[in-house]
């Protein structure tokens, strides 16, 4: 499985040769965040309209158990609120403006719930769901899987990724049908033998021929 994180990709013979004949999946990282605030419904709508194969998004859980789509554990960068996601209720998160930092045109854009995103994307685009776990939210993996199943996202249109191998282990125990990807800063050791990682997401400058062959 190969995912290419970019906004436009020419489908020519030279490209296909470079990637070993595998057709890349065009994945919009945090949605189309060049034109709209990252991890918001406007960014996801733009990715759909531009014909992407998948959207990569990040999920966390509020203090009252709602799975929301946002990248940083601290909400200050995108909302101005200096607080952790897991310390706030969903009602508190839903009051935050997640768009004004990007442009005044997106003022009052909210942090979406995973359920809202699934309602938007179902039947229109696939997903790469990155789970961002916390010791404060042990139910995050199970609730994420429950929602994906409820809205018809399966191994044909969804992968689950994480920087936490423990999270991937939990996902495989809950839902072995989902392809799981381990996000690595560096490829060190026999990581490719890890049983609960079906593929790896590695920064391009660290990829070697030996890594690909392994």
Place the predicted regions along the sequence by residue.
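Phosphate-group recognition and catalysis centered on beta-loop-alpha active-site segments
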Residues: 1-214
């Amino acid at each position: 499985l190969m995912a290419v994180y970019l906004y436009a990709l020419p489908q020519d013979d030279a490209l296909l040769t470079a990637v070993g004949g595998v057709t890349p999946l065009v994945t919009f990282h945090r949605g189309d965040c060049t034109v709209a605030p990252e991890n918001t419904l406007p960014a996801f709508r733009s990715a759909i309209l531009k014909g992407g194969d998948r959207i990569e998004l990040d999920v966390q859980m509020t203090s009252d158990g709602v799975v929301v789509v946002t990248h940083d554990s601290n909400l200050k960068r995108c909302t101005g609120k200096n607080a952790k996601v897991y310390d706030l209720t969903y009602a508190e998160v839903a009051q935050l403006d997640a768009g004004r930092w990007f442009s005044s045109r997106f003022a009052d854009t909210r942090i979406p719930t995973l359920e809202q995103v699934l309602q938007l994307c179902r039947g229109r685009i696939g997903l790469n769901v990155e789970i961002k776990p916390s010791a404060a939210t042990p139910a995050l993996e199970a609730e994420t899987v429950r929602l994906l199943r409820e809205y018809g996202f399966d191994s044909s249109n969804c992968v689950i990724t994480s920087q936490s191998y423990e999270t991937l282990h939990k996902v495989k125990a809950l839902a072995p049908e989902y392809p799981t990807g381990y996000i690595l800063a560096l490829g060190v050791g026999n990581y490719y033998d890890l049983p609960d990682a079906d593929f790896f997401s590695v920064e391009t400058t660290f990829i070697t021929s030996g890594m690909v062959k392994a």
